[in-house]
Structures are given as structure tokens and as C-alpha cells.
Amino acid sequence: MINISNILDLTNYAFVLFFGITAAFYFVGMHFEDNKKQYIFTILVFGCIQLIAYLLLGKQTLYTCYPLLIHLPLILLIFFVFHQSISMSIISVLTAYLLCTPRKWIGTLVSSFFGYNQDIANAAAILVTIPLLILVIKYLSPYVEKLK
């Protein structure tokens, strides 16, 4: 059934996917300006995988299987298709994963003022995604990229 909670859940998953793929690509030196087609294709394909898993398997199974459905294939994509070292492929995805945590923290903090309402947590996490991603790209990605 489609309701506001499901829409916020799906939107939050879409934003975290966008954040993770974009951050991981920047960490290996794949900047959006030079790789627009790769970004769009990757986000669309992984978004479809995520949506299908969400609809067929449910939210909890998607959350549990996320490393196998998204992280591992993204590592393999960066390594085999985009020809980055395996160590940088792993580091970029795991660093992006780690940096998704502040989104969740901020969402939880904001929702704590509203009885830990999950819809509020999702909305707050969605709202901080782009500003956080800009900070990560501008201030952190140049340092991670130097690990090559």
C-alpha cells in the first residue's frame, strides 16, 4: 500500500543510493562533470535493483541484504568496469557507506523532538543529503582520492 511513510522510505533509500554512488565515484576520481553517462546509468540500474528488492522482498530484507545487493556490486563495478584498483574500489564504497551515517544521526536527532517519528527521521535525512554530499565532495574526496 502506498502511503506517506512508504514514499518517504523509498525517497530516503533513493537519496542514500545517490549519495553513496556519487561519493564513491568521487573518491576514486570519477567526477560528475567528466562521467555523466556513467553516473546516470549506474544510479538508474542500482535504483531499479533497489526498488525491485524493496517491492518484492520488503524494507527489512532490503536493509539486511543491502551490502550484497548494492555495496558488493558497486565495488565490482568500480574495479572491473571503471578500472580502479581493488583497494580503492573497496575503500571508496566503504568510506561512502560510513559517511551515510551522519544523515541517519541527523534524522534521528530531529525525530527525537517528535517522539522518534520515522517519517520525520526520513524527511530530515533526505533534507541533509545534498548539503552533506557537497561537503564530502568539496572537502573530503580530494584526500581520499590521493590514496591511489
Question: Where on the chain are the PLM-derived regions?
Answer:
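Hydrophobic transmembrane alpha-helical segments in integral membrane proteins
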Residues: 1-17
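Juxtamembrane segments at transmembrane-helix boundaries
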Residues: 10, 18-36, 52-148
